[in-house]
Amino acid sequence: KTXATLFPGHGIGPEIXQAVXPIL
């Protein structure tokens, strides 16, 4: 769930962060 920490001020959920993360 690191994604959530990657986007702390974007209101993005941890699951979404995991999915976007790699894409970015």
Curated annotation (Swiss-Prot):
What name is this protein filed under? Unknown protein NF004 from 2D-PAGE
Other observations noted: On the 2D-gel the determined pI of this unknown protein is: 6.7, its MW is: 30.0 kDa.
